[in-house]
């Protein structure tokens, strides 16, 4: 609470584990008063951390890294509100998600936030999925988090959009060159 009072700005309250059974996942607070109101009421048995609140223009990008290359798959967005407009803050897990097939990185998330990691991916021999979530603020993307997973909302949608999901994921796990193929007409996915 002292940090919020000293900084005088809102924070997103997050759980570092976020398992399906976690007592909290994310609580988006848009004012310092919201943040201060939530802190004493949170079950912090798994710990919490505060993430700077930068607004609502949030998006994610999911790619596969294999054989030293980054293969963009989709841009995704999680639904964090139960209704259209500002009718309440998020107090729990996302309600669902959208994915857009995006091998060309239409919004620049991979170019700005994943490509700079390519030397590190190669140095350590990383292979697998990588997801970045960011907020667009002051005309640039600001990283909120990186994850090395497809995610429970986006993973099944990506698999259903790919014509060769087993081959693509299998080759990625082995660190082999990838050639993801897309099902015709599968441009978007939605999960509620």
Which role fits each region the language model picked out?
Residues 18-21, 137, 191:
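Short, active-site-adjacent cap segments at secondary-structure transitions
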Residues 9, 46, 188:
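Short coil/turn segments at beta-strand junctions that form active-site/ligand-binding loops
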Residues 153, 157-161, 182-183:
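A short glycine-/small-residue-rich loop at the edge of a beta-strand within enzyme catalytic domains
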Residues 24-153, 157:
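Internal nucleotide-binding/catalytic subdomain
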Residues 170-192:
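A glycine-rich beta-turn/hairpin centered on an aromatic-Pro dipeptide
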Residues 1-26:
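A conserved helix-loop-beta module that forms one wall/lid of the active-site cleft
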């Amino acid at each position: 609470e002292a940090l919020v009072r000293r900084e005088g700005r809102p924070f997103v309250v997050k759980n570092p584990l976020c398992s399906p059974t976690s007592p909290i996942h994310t609580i988006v607070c848009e004012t310092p008063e919201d943040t201060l109101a939530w802190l004493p009421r949170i079950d912090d048995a798994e710990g919490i951390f505060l993430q700077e609140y930068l607004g609502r223009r949030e998006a994610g990008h999911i790619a596969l890294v294999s054989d030293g290359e980054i293969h963009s798959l989709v841009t995704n967005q999680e639904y964090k509100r139960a209704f259209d407009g500002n009718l309440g803050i998020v107090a729990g897990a996302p309600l669902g998600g959208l994915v857009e097939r995006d091998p060309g990185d239409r919004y620049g998330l991979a170019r700005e936030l994943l490509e700079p990691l390519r030397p590190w991916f190669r140095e350590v021999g990383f292979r697998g999925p990588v997801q970045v979530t960011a907020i667009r603020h002051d005309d640039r993307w600001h990283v909120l988090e990186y994850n090395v997973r497809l995610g429970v909302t986006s993973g099944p949608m990506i698999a259903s959009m790919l014509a060769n999901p087993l081959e693509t994921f299998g080759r990625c796990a082995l660190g082999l060159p990838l050639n993801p193929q897309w099902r015709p007409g599968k441009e978007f996915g939605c999960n509620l």
